[in-house]
Amino acid sequence: NGRDIHLRGVLDCCVFPLTGYPSTDVEEWRRIFTTIRSYGMNHVRFHSWCPPEAAFTAADEVGMYLQAELPMWIKDVGQYPARRDFFEQEMYAVLEEYGNHPSFILMCNGNENEGDFAVLEDLVKKAQAHDGRRLYSASTARTHVPADQFYTSHVTEKGWITVYEGKPSTDWDRNETSAIDVPVIAHETGQRCMYPNFDEIKKYTGVVEARNMEVFRERLARHGMLHQADDFFRATGAHTVLQYKEVNESLLRSSKSGGFQLLGLQDFPGQGSAFVGILDAFWESKGLVTPEKFRESCAPTVLLAR
């Protein structure tokens, strides 16, 4: 529509510890998106899944851009024709069911796929022909194809997009690594773990039990250090907050950046014990940083020195 936008995004990795499945209640999704917006974000990437109708409705109301994906995170794309047909059917179903929602601006085939990218590009072209109201991409990370209308990745042919190297500096950006001719979004920026907050264990009253945190707590007690648990949590959490500030600001300084997708605002217990969030797995604050303070480095307008 001719309006420039810089996507300040987070991942939603389908983490629902109480139920094991996403809520179908608009009010719950309104709570989640309002929380995300309060930290300066305008965009949510659903990591290799598509949320229910309630999420799109809430996003329309709150004002949140969404990226839905097919349930594809595989190393051998194109090997099984029946599986490929399933993905195409799912693609059309998602577009038919949710395509009228204005919040639904991006769609991707899935996460870090490998294999036959001709198959992935064919899906992109079919989606574009079926419903041209949003932008499409073959895969989040790994390979850029000519049909891509945006590209999300760690790296291009010229180097890293995400901020995993170098020393903190106010003169540090990623302009030199954005040579692709479509908007480039930095993939899964952040990923800085902190020590667990053992006070969260009591929140796990549903289908998921926090047995990993129970093991960590028992080990710490066995070594006579349990009384230091909160110190470890707050010290490492403060470090993570500072690192995310550096990540966000470096990409905001990059005039060629299309945006970023932070991993994460929320913890990701779906793949090991990834305590990467300033919010816990329930989208609730850990008390490490206020939304107001976080927005100083993540907002439509951020004061930066170079």
What are these regions (language model features)?
Residues 33-34, 43-279:
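Substrate-binding/catalytic cleft of secreted carbohydrate-active enzymes
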